[in-house]
From Swiss-Prot:
Principal place of residence: cytoplasm
Alphabetical UniProt keywords: Cell projection, Cilium, Cytoplasm, Cytoskeleton, Flagellum, Methylation, Repeat
Keyword set includes Cytoplasm: yes
Modified residues (Asymmetric dimethylarginine): R243, R428
MORN repeats: 577-597, 600-622, 623-645, 646-662, 671-685, 691-707
UniProt function note: Flagellar radial spokes contribute to the regulation of dynein arm activity and thus the pattern of flagellar bending. They consist of a thin stalk, which is attached to the a subfiber of the outer doublet microtubule, and a bulbous head, which is attached to the stalk and appears to interact with the projections from the central pair of microtubules.
Gene: RSP1
Subcellular location(s) of the protein: Cytoplasm, Cytoskeleton, Flagellum axoneme
Source species of the chain: Chlamydomonas reinhardtii
Signal peptide annotation: none
Name of this chain's protein: Flagellar radial spoke protein 1
One Gene Ontology cellular component: motile cilium
Composition-biased stretches (Acidic residues): 303-329, 748-758
Length: 814
């Protein structure tokens, strides 16, 4: 990448910057271009990003924020565009840095190399009609791998000349411009130290704090609280106490239609943090009217009362002989002009209330919680609401005193004594997310779901996926079947151990008479930014959407069907799912973890297992093959817990069609199955034995032949077996017949639902272990027969171990 340096026209009306990353409209990529502004003091002055589409009082505007663009804006093409209007700039802003970033998506590789195309485009024009329009290829930078942010370019303003644009091209693994503030400052220093650019901002930066960051939270951002608190640190920092700050602001009231008309009152917004259990039932809540619950409370602690010195109000008395404005001979004074209207910050955080969560003290049954801000005035809704916003703040190590409070003054004084510019701040902002409302656009909105907090259990399907270290769920199910089986069996064993540990803890608690108050299952708390608008006059009116919110993590739209390729679902019985949803059901590649320890990885269609898949059962049995409507159907292989294996055709979950079954005695049974039972001609073989005969519902019935190869001695060395083997024999064949009670093998009649009707007059079919009613008849004496080959070609590949191989020419060969 080679960009500049070159000076942009000083009197230009508009500069445009954009990134292009979509090769086709179908590509589901979520890259964005941000701009970070630094002032002459080297301080971060303002930011522009997807959730803050205007900055510097409209001098920077995101392309999608159409109503904030001046009428004369010349629109440019681009997947994400920033418009800059230099004539609106404040003089204190000296440096702008442009950052391309790809937000991380849990369960999906999503970095700047995920697209086959990545370009940075610049265009401008001046009053003389001079124009510039050029794009620069960023793809070689992203191809390094693991690149989630690129500091693309820097612009700086010098005393002589206009804005100068220069390429940077620094790549970073962090997915947000807010996490690379130290690198942004270093870029400013590099302008001075490496390129000789004289900037006040560079001279003002005395030291760079490697932990400095600003929260840039995107919609549907999903992250564990511990990871968010750690930021760039390698080890997560446990969050034990969380503060949720709430803010909302309003549009100015419309002008009165009649003289003397009182302006309307501000809407009375309320909030509700509803906590749910795994069944979707409300456990408790914190709201405007309900200020306290287990492990949670609303409102800041009462501040200490300041001891104020009593001061007498001094009134100025006019001196003798001085005339007041109404005094005799005095000239009437003009009233002073009204002060200018204060500048309105559209992104002001106006704290309305706070919620404290003592995370370890929350009720164990709480699985998730949803934060909503409501105004159930269905006539006006959110018409007057400008912003609704919340901040998640880690206060595990304490809180910063409120500005202007006695504690803040004392902290500042203590910091000054230590030579610090400001007192240390023990708080960490984990997320700052809000919804911007356009005036009168949201009349139908009466409630906004801002944020979700939820437990992610260690044994979830998502964590099984993460343990594989693959890019996405399609890559997970595309692994070798044996690899998937090992991963699912590891989940099964972990589930068994966890259940045993829970049972032991419950027994110990019962014996000691203590109550288990903590959640016994290992988990982490995560947050997910929502920003979803709903109507209705109560929470009950959006019950369906709320169920989706607390049990589903993926892209959501109010009232719409679930549709996401990286969704996570939890179910009341403890099952979890990670994979694709379409039209509100599981569809596409997915991974399902049963609470029993069973697991499935494969394709779904219409909400059911359908297509190729791998499944591990609670007893350790495994299936690899085809599914239809949640059942085995097509070709597949089932390994039973005892080690035996069936490979062949299935229908409706049963063996049906041609197949091969290897048992634990290293024998091979071949034939045709119907509804799980062997029927018609079948062959069973061992190294020294072959049985060929007719079967009825799994029982031998009809003519048969036993073939015995007496000289195959498995416990003798290979050379000995080869030495004693003759060209043929002694191998004998015995024609015979088996019989079963008449009528016992008839197919049962079925009822309307397809279930067999019990027939008390029908004789029972012989069955294991006694096989009562089964008869055997030798048809004639044994006769010599050719040697047999084992294992049979039709039984290969052999799916079990330690099976010897015999051939006619060489004897025991393995």
């Amino acid at each position: 990448m080679a960009l500049g340096p070159f000076v942009l026209p000083f009197r230009g009306d508009q500069y445009s910057f954009g990134i292009n990353f979509k090769s086709s409209p179908e590509e589901k990529l979520n890259f964005d271009l941000s701009c970070v502004a630094f002032d002459v003091k080297g301080q971060l002055h303002d930011t522009l990003h997807a959730r803050k589409p205007t900055a510097l009082d409209g001098a920077l505007v995101k392309g999608f924020e159409k109503q904030a663009l001046p009428e004369e804006t010349v629109q440019v093409e681009g997947d994400d565009v920033i418009y800059m209007f230099p004539k609106k700039f404040e003089r204190q802003v000296e440096v702008l840095l442009f950052v391309a970033s790809a937000p991380s998506i849990p369960g999906k590789k999503h970095d700047l190399d995920s697209s086959s195309k990545l370009e940075f485009a610049v265009s401008y024009s001046d009053v003389g009609g001079q124009a510039f329009n050029q794009s620069f290829d960023l793809k070689p930078l992203a191809a390094q791998g693991g690149v989630s942010s690129i500091i693309v370019a820097v612009m700086y303003l010098q005393a002589e000349g206009g804005w100068t644009l220069r390429s940077v091209g620094d790549c970073h693994p962090f997915d947000s411009p807010g996490l690379i503030v130290p690198e942004l400052k270093q870029t400013i220093l590099n302008l001075r130290d490496h390129h000789g650019v004289q900037l006040d901002a560079a001279d003002a930066i005395q030291a760079i704090d490697p932990a400095e960051r600003v929260p840039v939270t995107r919609q549907f951002q999903d992250q564990s609280l511990d990871e968010a608190s750690a930021g760039r640190a390698a080890e997560p920092a446990p969050v034990k106490k969380l503060r949720i700050d709430l803010s909302w602001t309003f549009w100015p009231p419309p002008p009165p239609t009649e003289e003397g008309e009182e302006p309307p009152e501000e809407p009375a917004l309320e909030y509700n943090l509803v906590m749910y259990n795994k069944d979707g039932e409300e456990v408790q809540s914190i709201s405007t009217g309900n200020r306290e619950a287990t492990g949670a409370r609303a409102g800041r602690p009462e501040p200490e009362e300041d001891e104020e010195e009593e001061k007498e109000e001094e009134k100025e008395e006019p001196e003798e002989g001085e005339e007041g404005e109404e005094g005799e001979g005095g000239e009437p004074k003009e009233p002073p002009p009204p002060p200018p209207a204060p500048k309105v910050d559209p992104y002001e955080f106006k704290e309305r209330d706070v919620i404290y969560l003592d995370v370890p003290d929350l009720p164990a049954e709480v699985r998730s919680m949803v934060l909503l801000v409501t105004n159930y005035d269905e006539e006006n809704g959110f018409t007057r609401v400008r912003t609704v916003r919340c901040r998640l703040v880690d206060v595990s190590n304490g809180e910063a005193p409120l500005p202007g409070s006695k504690a803040a003054v004392a902290a500042a004084a203590a910091a000054a004594e230590q030579g610090l510019a400001a007192p240390p701040n023990p708080e960490r902002v984990l997320a700052d997310y809000g919804v911007l409302s356009k005036y009168e656009d949201d009349k139908a909105t009466t409630q906004v779901a801002l944020m979700k907090l939820y437990k992610e259990y260690a044994d979830s399907a998502f964590n099984v996926f993460r343990g594989a270290g693959v890019d996405n769920v399609a890559a997970f199910i595309g692994q070798e079947p044996d690899t998937i089986i090992n991963q699912l069996k590891a989940y099964l064993e972990a589930t068994k151990k966890q259940k045993a540990a829970e049972a032991a803890a419950a027994a110990a608690a019962e014996e000691s008479g203590e109550e288990i108050t903590a959640d016994p299952k290992p988990h982490v708390w995560r947050f997910r930014a929502l920003g979803l608008n709903f109507g209705g006059d109560s929470l009950e009116a959006i019950e369906h959407d709320l169920k989706n919110l607390f049990a589903f993590d993926g892209d959501l739209a109010p009232g719409a069907a679930r549709d996401s390729d990286t969704s996570r679902s939890s179910f009341p019985n403890g099952d979890t799912y990670f994979g694709s949803y379409a039209d509100d059901v599981k569809h596409g590649p997915g991974l399902y973890a049963f609470a029993t320890g069973a697991g499935y990885a494969g394709e779904y269609a219409g909400g059911k297992r359908h297509g190729r898949g791998v499944m591990v059962f609670p007893d350790g049995g495994t299936y690899v093959g085809e599914f239809v409507a949640d059942k085995f159907e097509g070709q597949g292989q089932y390994r039973y817990p005892d080690g035996s294996v069936y490979t062949g055709s299935w229908a409706a979950g049963q063996k049906h069609g041609p197949g091969v079954y290897w048992d634990t005695a290293r024998g091979c049974l071949r034939g045709e199955w119907k509804k799980g039972l062997l029927v018609g001609k079948g062959t069973y073989e061992q190294p020294a034995l072959r049985f060929e005969g007719e079967f009825v519902r799994g029982m031998p019935a009809g003519t048969a032949t036993y073939t015995l190869t007496g000289h195959r001695t498995l416990d003798m060395p290979c050379f000995a077996a080869q030495h004693i083997q003759a060209e043929e024999g002694p191998t004998l064949a015995l024609p015979c017949a088996y019989g079963i009670p008449p009528g016992s093998g008839d197919e049962p009649q079925l009822d309307e639902e397809g279930q067999p009707i019990e027939d008390t007059d029908k004789p029972p079919l012989p069955a294991h272990p006694k096989y009562e009613g089964l008869t055997f008849t030798a048809e004639q004496l044994p006769g010599a027969a050719p040697d047999t080959v084992f294992p049979p070609e039709e039984g290969k590949p052999v799916p079990i171990t330690a099976v010897p191989a015999f051939s006619v020419s060489t004897g025991l060969v393995a």
